[in-house]
Amino acid sequence: LNTHVLKNRGFVSLWAGSAISELGGSFGTFCNSIIVYELTGSKLALGSMWLLYFLPSIVFQLVSGPFIDKWSRKWIMIFSQWTRALIFLVPLLSMFLGHLEVWHIYVVQVIIGLVTPLYVPASQAITPTIVAKEQLSTANAYLDGTTRLMMFLAPMAGGVVINYIGTDFTLLLVFILLALSGFLLLRMDEQRVPQGIRKTWLEQFNEGIHYFFKERTIVWLGIFLAFVQFGVGVTMVINLPYITDVLKGNYEDYGLFMAGFPLGYVIGSLLIGKIKFRSRRMFMLGSLVIGGLTYISLGIINAIILAIIVEIIAGIMMAFFSIHNITICQRAIPNHMMGKVMSVRLVISRTAMPIGIVFGGIISELWGIRPLYIMIGLAISLVSIIGIVFPYFKFIDGPPQPELLPKKNNYARQ
């Protein structure tokens, strides 16, 4: 890698700020999940917590996108970080005063859901303005690689930290990390780009919708992804009680379990360039079939170590599907339409997550956790098998391509 980018003070500030933000955000998510489950013992309440994050996040992502370029991206990011830091003082102070209630966590989730959609697109947009064009790929590699490393380390570290110092001091650590992230971002020297006449938000969004539904490969891959996202929504509700109640583990075990998927994704992303295949459809949808089987496995096994191994396998399989999926989209969509179409794709796929959260919260209370893992695993595997078996879906193979290398990775289980 070109090390000259590390001599750029603005980039180093962005790099460090993003890494600390990822760590603080992951710790905060851990704390919120544990507090809600300890206060209520209800998987439905845990699901409500995630809904209160995702619903505002999805809605605000729609309306905020066209306006990001009009504002200072640097100050959007700083505002996002400091707002997140301050809102975590609500449960922290309530805990110290002995008056912590579930609604305090719900307020935190709503606010975080509103400000998080601001940070990510602003971060992606500001990077080309603070590094030279020839250093952009190196800068993105540093940013993306560090973020994925934090996603791997944070669950393990979060489990250990909460287990040893408690949720109250961990919330204080979250506040410090997010506030520090904002201060680091102050060191960036933003170069504002003059804006020409822009279309209205509605006009831009309509363009994205029309193009998205015109490309059937993108549409159907989005539908397959939506089934996976539905499963992710379900697991957001049941992963914590699965480890602590079903497998009788502690918060350290939960952290290791949650780290398994991003670790697998990193492994999968390293392997993907070395794997040759004849049919893109068979490779991608076959990966989803195996991914569905990992859910079924979680519904059967009794050992935490096996559950962690299964999550690593799931991460590898999801990398195979997701990286090819995003690369197909990047190659099919014209550059001037990329943001609009990608936002439509993201909103449609992410909408499946709240549905999964509601489903998981209700069904887990009625039927239990193990049957739910088996159910979502069967759904993902069966839908993927249909895509493999039915000749209609041959268009997913597309034109012959010697290689399909990723431009961007998404390391979440989605």
Ranges and model annotations:
Residues 1-11, 190-223, 407-414:
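Juxtamembrane intracellular "pre-TM" segments in multi-pass secondary transporters
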Residues 2-56, 210-259:
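Helix-loop boundary and gating motifs at the non-cytosolic
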Residues 28, 37, 90-95, 112, ...:
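MFS-fold secondary transporters
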Residues 40, 72, 94-95, 99, ...:
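Helix-breaking motifs and short loop linkers at transmembrane-helix boundaries and internal kinks
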Residues 59, 76, 80, 90, ...:
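C-terminal transmembrane bundle of multi-pass solute transporters/carriers
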Residues 125, 129, 171, 175-199, ...:
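Helix-loop junctions on the cytosolic side of multi-pass membrane transporters
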